[in-house]
């Protein structure tokens, strides 16, 4: 079981260089989870870049049987703790944004590795999926 960050979904949908590696990890993950807050974040980014990509994302998530996880109160607490420790403006090299904090919280709450792109989460205590 793995948690997927917005950045990984975007890399696949937008056919970025890392996209194929992320797709392989999602296929191998058997049970992939995406937080509802990160689903919204992904749709917002895609809508801003090119709304025509949103159906592709929806189809990808459906074909991979990605489970959308609601945000619980305890995950909200974990996300706030992540912000205080790793968030933008906290003078930490991770500089997690709002969506990052929720992906971090879901992964921590469920004890799952996180599939992500970029150099933000590597500065946290999260377990990377790849």
List the predicted regions and their residue ranges.
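General small-molecule cofactor/ligand-binding pocket signal
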Residues: 33, 67-69, 129
């Amino acid at each position: 079981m793995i948690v997927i960050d917005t950045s990984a979904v975007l890399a696949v949908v937008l056919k970025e260089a890392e996209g194929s590696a992320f797709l392989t990890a999602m296929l191998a993950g058997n049970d992939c989870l995406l937080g509802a807050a990160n689903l919204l974040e992904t749709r917002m980014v895609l809508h801003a870049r090119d709304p025509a990509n949103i159906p592709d994302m929806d189809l990808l998530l459906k074909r991979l049987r990605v489970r959308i996880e609601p945000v619980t109160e305890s995950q909200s607490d974990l996300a706030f703790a992540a912000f205080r420790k790793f968030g933008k403006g906290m003078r930490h090299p991770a500089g997690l944004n709002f969506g990052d904090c929720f992906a971090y919280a879901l992964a921590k709450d469920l004890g799952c590795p996180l599939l992500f792109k970029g150099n933000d989460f590597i500065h946290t205590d999260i377990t990377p999926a790849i």
